[in-house]
Amino acid sequence: MICFKEFSALSPVELELVFAWRNDERIRKHFINESVGYDEHFAFAKSLKDDENKRYFLVFDDEKPIGVINFVSISKDECEFGIYQNPNLRGFGRILLSNLAHYAFRNLRVKRLVARALKDNTKAIRLFLGFGFTLTS
């Protein structure tokens, strides 16, 4: 069973896991931002508790952490999302994206999802296109 846990509710061990994933070269190379510092990461997670425009989740398949999804710039019409899977696992991209879309349309009640991907992130682009997303500039 897939479940989400908000970053602001993560244990220190879970936050350290997300920190390690976020700074893993296999993940980080697809981010616009550089690596994140330890204190900055923990402060960011704490700040999300009071931020209505952002939602970040650690996603579990049963009790196994499989990835991270997030929503930013949330409005009544749309939001931008981000997604990455545990760099030590394979095959969870579709599961993460499917659950992300379900949450966005059902809980956030947005009408449109927007994602950004670097041009060389072909896996993400193929995944998004497979779900019916369209490319823009």
Protein language model annotation of sequence segments:
Residues 1-17, 21, 56-137:
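Acyl-donor (CoA/ACP) binding surface of acyl/acetyltransferases
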